[in-house]
Amino acid sequence: MSARLPALWKRLSSTISPRPAPPKAHHHAPIREAAFPNGYVLTGLHCGIKKTGALDLAVILSTTPKPASAAACFTRNAFKAAPVVVSEEVLQRSASTARALVVNSGCANAVTGKQGMEDAWAMVRATDALLGHSAKESETLVMSTGVIGQTLPICKVLAGIESQSSDSQTKSLGSDFTAWERAAKAFMTTDTFPKLRARTFSIDGREYKMAGMDKGAGMIHPDMGPPRMAGQLHATLLGCIMTDAAVSPRSLQSALTYAVDRSFNSISVDGDMSTNDTIVVLANGSAASDPAAEIDEERDPRTYQIFRDELTTFAADLAQLVVRDGEGATKFVTVSVNGAATYEDAHRIASRISTSALVKTALYGQDANWGRILAATGSVPLSVPIDPTRVSVSFIPTDGSPALPLLVNGEPETVDEARAKEIISVEDLEIEVQLGIGSENAKYWTCDFSYEYVRINGDYRS
């Protein structure tokens, strides 16, 4: 049977010429130093996990006198990696505060048993030591990404962390663009560019800053929730966002949970959930010395909602970078599902379309096969059943030209195939599904499946 596979592959691929992924480096550009939040120092370095010599360890410290409010959303995979379990424990012990984050790439430290847990705690303790004598135990969150089932070269990792101590000649912690960029690069595995963003926003005349980085290109279909939430099963998605706003821990977690559902939990590259998916937010309050300026959902819902919406927009920007860098991807696709009875219904349908291998391969082949979109839509159980006579499907061009209806109120349109191919041949496009049931909408961001995706993942460990 195996001898037939090359011939079968050749026959199946003969009708579509492999196309290289479009250039992606332009999604990363220098950021002015004034855009980064106050009160953070960070770096990225090579400690020896990656054989290539690439950066594989990031250290991020908050320098404010008091610990930063900390919030996180973690994978709901039953096989949670050691750093996920340890970070959940740190947040529980510290009443949702933290002073540091340490991240390694090249080894996931997942399904590594007792040794993996010991190694994750060792990374926490080593980073805690960088904070000085005033630091309490367990003020560091930890994240890892890479191959599952392999243990960390922990001596190399600890040496890398210790190289950032105050008396070390190799200390490289900083707050300029280079420091932020090196940290972002240390997150990377199969990523083709570092994913780093920063922005400034105002609430009631007070200026705040927010910066963040994430990584991910494969094994991307997150379903993350707050610490200790039980959930269902589904390369890793890791991300961190730092702000100099003062936000109460409870409100920060509430805002992050809302934001993640509309950003990182709304992307898919290949439909596979990682054991390590983690998003962390630190809010150190360095922009507001007045305790009354702390953002709190119960005390001032209006101010909280402004912050929550800023965080959601920023998180969506970071999440979309992951899809744009999807392994072998040639297209960035927005899936919009409108007119559902509930947001959850719209989100489930958008997720199903975004993970359909048939839809994703049709996108790569530039085939306007809307029947696959409709089949995916109809396969999802909803709180209010679909009425097929109300459903419409369209391609939305990204150049501002008119939409191309494919199905209108359950009736197929006579499609201009040349126009459809023109729309689907560009890098960015949107699929819109109108259910005609209610007023709730949801978006998902996905990419196509290419031959290159198969090659990357077939060779991942070699």
Curated annotation (Swiss-Prot):
Has the keyword Ribosomal protein been applied to this entry? Answer: no
Keywords tagged on the record: Acyltransferase, Amino-acid biosynthesis, Arginine biosynthesis, Autocatalytic cleavage, Mitochondrion, Multifunctional enzyme, Transferase
The EC code for this enzyme is 2.3.1.35, 2.3.1.1
Query: What does the entry list as the binding residues for substrate?
Result: T189, K215, T236, E327, N457, S462
Q: How is it modified after translation?
A: The alpha and beta chains are autoproteolytically processed from a single precursor protein within the mitochondrion.
Q: Where is this site: Involved in the stabilization of negative charge on the oxyanion by the formation of the oxyanion hole?
A: T145, G146
Q: Can you state which reaction this protein catalyses? A: N(2)-acetyl-L-ornithine + L-glutamate = N-acetyl-L-glutamate + L-ornithine; L-glutamate + acetyl-CoA = N-acetyl-L-glutamate + CoA + H(+)
Instruction: Output the Gene Ontology cellular-component terms.
Output: mitochondrial matrix
Q: Active-site positions, per UniProt?
A: T236
Q: Does the keyword field hold Ligase?
A: no
Q: What GO molecular function terms would the record report?
A: glutamate N-acetyltransferase activity; L-glutamate N-acetyltransferase activity
Show the Pfam families listed in the entry: ArgJ
How does this chain assemble? Heterodimer of an alpha and a beta chain.
Misc. comment: This protein may be expected to contain an N-terminal transit peptide but none has been predicted.
Role: Catalyzes two activities which are involved in the cyclic version of arginine biosynthesis: the synthesis of acetylglutamate from glutamate and acetyl-CoA, and of ornithine by transacetylation between acetylornithine and glutamate.
State the similarity comment: Belongs to the ArgJ family.
What protein name applies here? Arginine biosynthesis bifunctional protein ArgJ, mitochondrial
The organism is Postia placenta (strain ATCC 44394 / Madison 698-R) (Brown rot fungus)
